[in-house]
Curated annotation (Swiss-Prot):
Residues 31-40, 210-221, 229-241 have a biased composition (Low complexity). One of its GO terms (molecular function) is kinase inhibitor activity. GO terms for cellular component: plasma membrane. This is Probable BRI1 kinase inhibitor 1. Keywords: Brassinosteroid signaling pathway, Lipid metabolism.
Amino acid sequence: MTMNTPRPRSQPPPPHPPLFKPTTPPPPPLLSTSTSTSPPHDFSFAHYLSSPPPSVQRRGRADMSRTPPLGRVGSDLSHNNYSSKANQHRQTGSSSSSSSKEKDREYKAKSKASSPFFSGLGGSWRSGLSRDEEVKRKAKAKTRGLDVGQWVKKYMASMVEHLLASFSRHGGGEREKREQQRRRPHSFSAHGPSALREQRERWRRRRGQLSSAPASLRASPVNSGHLSVGGSVKVSTSSEESTMEELQSAIEAAIAHCKNSITVAK
């Protein structure tokens, strides 16, 4: 005859599945000691005696439903740790941001305090640079003006020299010609164009100062050379009875000779 051992009732499932498996094994089921020690005729009443009353079972189920599983407890703990760390990080971040803001304010205050000094230095430096540039520009303008003035002076000097040289060439040639004409001998010879030119020039320059000789002296070959002009000419004749007629005839002959020479020159 086999003994029918009472099966323990299975525990109700937890309300929430565990997030992770617990490392500790579950407790063994509660078995009454009366099952092993009770006689065979009392076995039919053993499972009634060993099972707790319904009120106790309901209370145990309520307690189990109230107590969260181990996985939920672990997740709650990890969430609490994460939230605490996040709060701590936020606090540190806010403190660091506040400290950085304070440092920025201090730096701005220092820069504002030192900005007038540096701005004054910068303004003086810029003004010095502008003055140097102005001085350099004025010096360049002066040098350019001097260069232009020197160039104009050189050009004018060269032009004046050129004009003087041209005038001197023309004037020198004329002067030389005049000197040569003055130095040429004058004669009463009625032969050749050179004699006519010389006589014309002589009558132009020495008008009113020429003393002509009588016809006998004018025709003689001895007096055909150079005549001295400027003083009274003494004419020696064979006879001392020279009359006004002879002088008049000589003057008329000289005038006719001059007219002929002028017409030939034209």
